[in-house]
Amino acid sequence: MELFDLNCPKYFASIEKNDYIEFLNQTKEGYVTIHHDSILIGAYGVHKISSETASQSWTLIHPKYQNQGIGRLIMERVFSYLKSNQLDNLFLSTSQQTEAFFLKFGAIRIDYIENGWDEGLHRIEMKIERAIR
C-alpha cells in the first residue's frame, strides 16, 4: 500500500484506496510490479476485455522514480502485451495529472468528468486505437 499512499493525493484520491485493495485481492494475473534494488517502484495492470481490446488500470510509479523512464517502460510492456494477444485497442482511466503522458503514446480523450475521482481530481477516460505497434 505504500506505493499507493505515495501517489496520494496528486495522482489518486485517498477514497480510492479500498477500490485498489479490492482490485488487488481479486486480480490473480495481469497486475505487474517493477522493483529496483528490492524497492517497489512501479505497478500496472493490463487485462483483455474483448477480442480486440484491453484495459490498463492502476498504473503507479514511486515519486522518487518518476521522470526516469519507468512510465515509458510500462507503456512498452503494455504495447507488447497487446501485440502478443493481437489486441488493437486500449482503454484507460486517468486524471488531468497524467493525461499529457498518455497523449504521447497516442491516447485520445473520450470522456471527462470534473471531480470524477475526488474534488480537484478529474476523471479522464482515454483510448488508444490501433495500439499494436
Task: Give a label for each model feature.
Residues 9-36, 40-45:
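Active-site rim helix/loop that mediates acceptor-substrate recognition in acyltransferases
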Residues 82-95:
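Conserved GNAT acetyl-CoA-binding A-motif
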Residues 37-39, 49-52, 131:
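Short strand-connecting beta-turns/loops that link adjacent beta-strands
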Residues 61, 67-80:
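Conserved acetyl-CoA-binding loop-helix of GNAT-fold acetyltransferases
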Residues 102-103:
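Conserved active-site tyrosine of GNAT-family acetyltransferases
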Residues 1-7, 132-133:
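A short, well-structured alpha-helix characteristic of acyl/acetyltransferase catalytic modules
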Residues 52-63:
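Conserved acetyl-CoA binding element of GNAT-fold acetyltransferases
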Residues 91-93, 108-127:
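Conserved catalytic-core motifs of GNAT/GCN5-like acyltransferases
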